[in-house]
């Protein structure tokens, strides 16, 4: 019988609870099981079940576990399940005997009343009345045993241990909200507005920021629009999900900072930071490192079969693959799946009809698990958020960009490709095998090589490197015998290459490797075009072996000199060289006021395609001059934009390079979409265009512009730095990078995001008005070219 009890404890009790509740159980059982701080941190569910079996000989601690679960509102359903499982083991006869011991006057129970009897054992009526009395009695009546009052809540045990002290028996603790197990969808909606058991935690806690989402807009039950973001923070012993309802704190929750939080709320295993909370950066003597196991635990996503077993009311975070999307009038059903099963995610409000497709990954924040008819669903609530991780770009299926076979994709590391600068001479290029075939280079590779040579010459000469002789890195089709390399003078000065040129050369070498591999050139040995100072005497050409060994071959991966915060792990630099003509560019503007981060927008085009560009390196402003032809490489493709960062290569193309952009393509770049077209577009796309302001309304932190044309009206919602622009009814707004967001009535609205920009085109009578620095005035309708 003891073994059966242990099976219930482990397989149907501990196994199905989440990590936070398991840590809570360990804390509550710490006295009974003699768990020290290290054991509480390191023991897993199996080890705890073993200790419970040893300590509680009769039922392996099942009764104790049921009592704990009953005190946690989100686990009440699970407590009932465990009672029924315990009843099955004990049998009806033993249940009747137990009932007689408790209440000798009670009649023998039937099978159905046996369930209630078992419930009485774990939560007898007298105990319920006593608990109710305690709640009314005040502080004196609220004292209970330490083992029942010390979960490692963010403000209690967990945070205390993180700061080097054990939780006090009298520490005020927080309780998750009283989630009902009722499965009616109306109850789910009601649950969003029902007051939760919020516990104000005044004690300051020190945490490290692990990650944050972008700010997003949500709607309160009072139909008021507000902005928030989610974050994940950690101490040295545990992590916490945080709702940050004060977006002015975004800078604090940034860059792996260590911060101090006080006056926050705690509920649902979450922390809530609002306008009343205090957040400050920790001092230099308050730094600490979060163990990797805590970081990995914070990133962990539960398997779907485990979610199906969890109690209704749990809050869920995680990354799931989208299998199917069904859009209804007010809700969207996202069917997610993994290798263990499937589950529906119901999105409403800001989670309704987000732009995603099958194969994308959905990162869910703060979704509620609900059950109905033994079926589990994840339901979005007021603060829920979905972040899309797009599947592999379809362009990867293009033969031009498909991965090459293993032997074609392997090159030596940079150290073997001669990119070091030990002294002041140029290194003699490494030569290919002596007998390459005449088809060693394809025609496409020859074109690529020609482009690369031109590009490298321009870039290095532009950086100020003065080569005393012919440019030695030109490469081309190899003949049937090795070429004698062109050698520089024997005594160039030690300042032959500047540090800046060294960086340029390193970038160019990396870029050429990526480009030529992408084009399909098959180099049987080390890359021959690496350049750099060598020793004080010429090198004999280094010849690779006829059959290169795998010891010096490795799969080439693009190397980024700097990994900016804006680039997520799902985005990658595009290594292909893109020659474009600049059509227009905005002025530089500050998009992050506190850190004074600047950027500008641009529109560029090839001879058959137009691209919107976000440029985060304002030193490149001169490059993005209208009608100039430039070459761009190592840029990032995201959300329909090309993004240019400090690691991106941008250079002028030869003066004799001509590019004719069709007039129809130029017109398409400057056209403003009609409002009725916007209403039918996919929500989540980004919009540029010029619209007339029909009405302006300022409400709190937001400014609402009603724009109109001859096809309809739409609302533009502006937040943050753009709310102070000088704009009146009748003016025109040139909007850049505004997100098309869903709105009730399925009309949609345009919302400002962090990279949005507004240019005000004033009417003649207001021409002399002073404008906000974030905007500019223009009276000519020909604003694009």
Curated annotation (Swiss-Prot):
Pfam families xref list: HIN, PYRIN
Known outcome of mutating residue 627 to A: Impairs DNA binding
Keyword Cell inner membrane among UniProt keywords: no
Regulation: induction: Strongly induced by IFNG/IFN-gamma and, to a lesser extent, by alpha interferon. In HL-60 cells, maximum induction by IFNG/IFN-gamma occurs within 12 hours whereas, for IFN-alpha, only 10-fold induction was observed after 36 hours. Induced in vitro by dimethylsulfoxide, retinoic acid and 1,25 dihydroxyvitamin D3. Induced in monocytes by IFN-alpha and viral dsDNA. Induced by glucose restriction.
Domain HIN-200: start-end pairs: 189-389, 562-761
Modified residues (N6-acetyllysine): 45, 99, 128, 214, 444, 451, 561, 598, 614
A GO MF label: RNA binding
Annotated effect of mutating residue 99 to R: Minor effect on nuclear localization (mimics acetylated state)
Composition bias, Low complexity: 104-114
Annotated effect of mutating residue 734 to A: Impairs DNA binding
Tissue: Expressed in peripheral blood leukocytes, fibroblasts and lymphoid cells. Present in myeloid precursors (CD34+) and throughout monocyte development, but its expression is down-regulated in erythroid and polymorphonuclear precursor cells. Present in prostate, ovary and breast (at protein level).
The Pyrin domain, residue ranges: 1-88
Entry comment, domain topic: The HIN-200 domains mediates dsDNA binding via electrostatic interactions.
Record function comment: Binds double-stranded DNA. Binds preferentially to supercoiled DNA and cruciform DNA structures. Seems to be involved in transcriptional regulation. May function as a transcriptional repressor. Could have a role in the regulation of hematopoietic differentiation through activation of unknown target genes. Controls cellular proliferation by modulating the functions of cell cycle regulatory factors including p53/TP53 and the retinoblastoma protein.
Known partners and oligomeric status: Forms homooligomers; isoform 2 can self-associate or associate with isoform 1 or isoform 3. Interacts with TMEM173, AIM2, PYCARD and CASP1. Interacts with BRCA1, TP53, E2F1, RB1 and SP1. Interacts with MTA1. Interacts with PYDC5.
Protein name: Gamma-interferon-inducible protein 16
Source organism per UniProt: Homo sapiens
């Amino acid at each position: 019988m003891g073994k059966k009890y242990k099976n219930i404890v482990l397989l149907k009790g501990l196994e199905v609870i989440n990590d936070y509740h398991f840590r809570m159980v360990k804390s509550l059982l710490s006295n009974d099981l003699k768990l020290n701080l290290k054991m509480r941190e390191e023991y897993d569910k199996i080890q705890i079940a073993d200790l419970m079996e040893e300590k509680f000989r009769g039922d392996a601690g099942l009764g104790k576990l049921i009592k704990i679960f009953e005190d946690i509102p989100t686990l009440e359903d699970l407590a009932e399940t465990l009672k029924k499982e315990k009843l099955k083991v004990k049998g009806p006869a033993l249940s009747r005997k137990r009932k007689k011991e408790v209440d000798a006057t009670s009649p023998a129970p039937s099978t159905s009343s046996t369930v209630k009897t078992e419930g009485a054992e774990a939560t007898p009526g007298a105990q319920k009345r006593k608990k109710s009395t305690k709640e009314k009695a005040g502080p004196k009546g609220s004292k209970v045993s330490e083992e029942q009052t010390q979960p490692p809540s963010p403000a209690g045990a967990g945070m205390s241990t993180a700061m080097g002290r054990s939780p006090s028996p009298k520490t005020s603790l927080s309780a998750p909200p009283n989630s009902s197990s009722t499965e009616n969808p109306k109850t789910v909606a009601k649950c969003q507005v029902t007051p939760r058991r919020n516990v104000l935690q005044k004690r300051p806690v020190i945490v490290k920021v692990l990650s944050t989402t972008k700010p997003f807009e949500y709607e309160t039950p009072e139909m008021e629009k507000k902005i928030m973001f989610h974050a994940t923070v950690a101490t040295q012993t545990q992590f916490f999900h945080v709702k940050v309802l004060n977006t002015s704190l975004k800078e604090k929750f940034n860059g792996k900072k260590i911060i101090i939080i006080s006056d926050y709320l705690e509920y649902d295993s979450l922390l809530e930071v609002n306008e009343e909370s205090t957040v400050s950066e920790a001092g230099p003597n308050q730094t600490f490192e979060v163990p990797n196991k805590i970081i990995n635990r914070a990133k962990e996503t539960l398997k779907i079969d485990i979610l199906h077993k969890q109690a209704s009311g749990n809050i869920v975070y995680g990354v799931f693959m989208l299998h199917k999307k069904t859009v209804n009038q007010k809700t969207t059903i996202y069917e997610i799946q993994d290798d263990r099963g499937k589950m529906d995610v119901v999105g409403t409000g800001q989670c309704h009809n987000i732009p995603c497709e099958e194969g994308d990954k959905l990162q869910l924040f703060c979704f509620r698990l609900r059950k109905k008819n033994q079926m589990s669903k994840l339901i979005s609530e007021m603060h829920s958020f979905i972040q899309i991780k797009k599947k592999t770009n379809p362009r990867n299926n293009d033969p031009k960009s498909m991965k090459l076979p293993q032997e074609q994709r392997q090159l030596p590391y940079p150290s073997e490709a001669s990119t070091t600068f030990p002294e002041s001479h140029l290194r003699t290029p490494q030569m290919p095998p002596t007998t390459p075939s005449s088809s060693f280079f394809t025609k496409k590779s020859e074109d690529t090589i020609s482009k690369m040579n031109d590009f490298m010459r321009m870039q290095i000469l532009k950086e100020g490197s003065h080569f005393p002789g012919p440019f030695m890195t030109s490469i081309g089709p190899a003949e049937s015998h090795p070429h004698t390399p062109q050698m520089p003078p024997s005594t160039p000065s030690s300042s032959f290459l500047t540090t800046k040129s060294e960086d340029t050369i390193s970038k160019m070498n990396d870029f050429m490797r990526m480009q030529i591999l992408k084009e399909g050139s098959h180099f049987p040995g080390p890359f021959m075009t690496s350049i750099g100072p060598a020793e004080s005497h010429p090198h004999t050409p280094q010849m690779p072996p006829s059959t290169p060994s795998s010891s010096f071959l490795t799969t080439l991966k693009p190397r980024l000199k700097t990994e900016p915060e804006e680039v997520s792990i799902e985005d990658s630099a595009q290594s292909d060289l893109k020659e474009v003509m600049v059509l227009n560019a905005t002025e530089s503007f500050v998009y992050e006021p506190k850190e004074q981060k600047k950027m500008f927008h641009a529109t560029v085009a090839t001879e058959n395609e137009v691209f919107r560009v976000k440029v985060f390196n304002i030193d490149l402003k001169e490059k993005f001059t209208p009608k100039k032809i430039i070459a761009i490489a190592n840029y990032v493709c995201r959300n329909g934009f090309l993004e240019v960062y400090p690691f991106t290569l941008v250079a002028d193309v030869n003066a004799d390079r001509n590019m004719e952009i069709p007039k129809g393509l130029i017109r398409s770049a400057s056209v403003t979409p009609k409002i009725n077209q916007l209403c039918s577009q996919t929500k989540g796309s980004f919009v540029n265009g010029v619209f007339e302001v029909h009405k302006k309304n300022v409400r709190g932190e937001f400014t609402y512009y009603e724009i109109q044309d001859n096809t309809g009206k739409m609302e533009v919602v502006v937040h943050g730095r753009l709310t102070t622009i000088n704009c009146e009814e009748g003016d025109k707004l040139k909007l850049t990078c505004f997100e098309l967001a869903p709105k009730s009535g399925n009309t949609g609205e345009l919302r400002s995001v962090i990279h949005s920009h507004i240019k005000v085109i004033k009417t003649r009578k207001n021409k002399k008005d002073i404008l906000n620095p974030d905007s500019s005035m223009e009276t000519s309708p020909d604003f694009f070219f």
